[in-house]
Amino acid sequence: MVLYGLKSCDSCRKALKALPQATFVDLRAQGVPGAVLQAALDRFGAALVNTRSTTWRGLGAEERARPPLDLIAAHPALMKRPLIEEAGALYLGWGPETRAALGLA
């Protein structure tokens, strides 16, 4: 199990605490492999970009119009977190649906 996130993200910290066996990958330091990021975009679409973040609010209209993968490559904090990869399946966020799917409900 791999958890992609940020050390400073509350949701990521909660997920790591509940999933001590997960390998943590820092989005800023290491990034997300291109194939995983593309699979996440295919699975979650526009929801992959966190439009409620301060990073998003600081972007101009021209920058916001860029493709999601380009935006995330330029601004890793724009990706909704955590992104969890488990046995080929991807989960986004740390809501009740993700916890239930991982058997933690």
Regions found by a protein language model. Give the residues of each.
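Local sequence-structure signature of Cys/Sec-based thiol-disulfide redox active-site neighborhoods
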Residues: M1-Q30
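Thiol/selenol-based redox catalytic cores and closely related redox-interacting motifs
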Residues: L27-A105
